[in-house]
Every structure is written in structure tokens, then in C-alpha cells.
Amino acid sequence: NFHNTLSRYIKRLWPVITVQEWDPKVKSHTVLVGGVYYSDKDEDFEKCIELTFVYNPSIKKLKIGTRKFRTICGVIADTILHEIIHMRQYRRRGFKMLPEYASSASSSKVREEQIYLGCTDEIDAYGFNIACELLEKFRGNWKESIKFLNCDLKNTRIRGGCWKMYLKAFKHDHDHEIIKRLKKKVIRYLPRAEDGKPFKSRDWICH
């Protein structure tokens, strides 16, 4: 069983909870990966990072090639590191919540997305994810990675991962305060992304 085997391996490396879900909208022989950090569980010294794997219910046997499997593993690592950054954020400030970003978007859907992505915690966590994505995209070339951050990706089919997600949410406005803050965060995280971990210290997943 793919899910059980993968879950067992992940739990050997990280103290996380794994959840299996089914959705007919998921493409055949594909796995969607999501993650969440629970600050209340963390404060009570319980396992606080949850990974969710979503599969198509019509597929009895999952067929995944080497290339797709590597992609899935990359997404899992990015997701766990994203949530570990959130864990560190909450622990450092004594589990206090931060105020939400005040979006002025007229559309409720856009406003909801901007409130989520505009949060200081998300800018920090996605900053690391984007730094990793860019170094992978440009094979470790910092100059090309930074150059890409200043490109106009509107009306293009260029894959931009989380960076393009932010640009879309904030109307591809490179002068927007959130986009400018995120750019600085990404550049600051490049050396850490090169090491493959968001922090220098080794105790970033321990109390």
C-alpha cells in the first residue's frame, strides 16, 4: 500500500500526523499533498504538524513513475518545511497570534486569498519555499533566481510555482507592499535554501 509505506517512512524522519483522503476531482495516478500546523497541539506538547494525502477513489492501484515520485517527495519536503517554519514562529513568540493582513480587494475570493498570503507568517514560510523553487529551477544560480523575481509573468505560461501564486493574488503588482516584502524574504532565504533547511540550528523541530 503506497500510502502506508510512505507514511511509515515519513514518520521515521519527522514527528508528524498523516491523513488519507479521497476526492474524485484528483487526477488518476496523482497524489495531492497538503499540510497544516496546529499551535494549540504544539503548546500541549502533542504532534502538531499534519500531512494530508488526497487520492482518486476510483484508483485501486497507484501507478507512479520515478519522475512523478521524485516530484511528490519534493512537495512533501516543501510542505513539512513550510509547517516547521510556522512551528518555529509560534514557539518564538509564545504561541501568540498575529493580526491579519487588511486586504482592500472588492472580490471576497481575492480578499480571502490576500488575507491568507499577506500574513507575515505566510510571507516568511513561502519565502523559503520560493527560494527553494527558484534554486531548483535555475540549478543553484542566484543571479538568475533574483532576475526571475523581477520578471513580468502576467499573461505568460511560464511556471512560477508559489511566486506566481502570490503575483496572481496581488494583481502582478511588483510595487505592492506584500510583493516587495516577499521578494526581500526570498533573497534572504537563498543561502538557507541552498543548504536545504530554513534554519542554521539543528534543534528547529525540537522543544
Annotate each language-model stretch with its function.
Residues 1-14:
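Zn2+-dependent metallopeptidase catalytic core
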Residues 29-74, 90-91:
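Active-site scaffold of zinc-dependent metalloenzymes
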Residues 71, 75-76, 120, 124:
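Amphipathic alpha-helical recognition patches that constitute DNA-binding helices
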Residues 109-119, 123, 127-207:
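Long, well-structured alpha-helical subdomains associated
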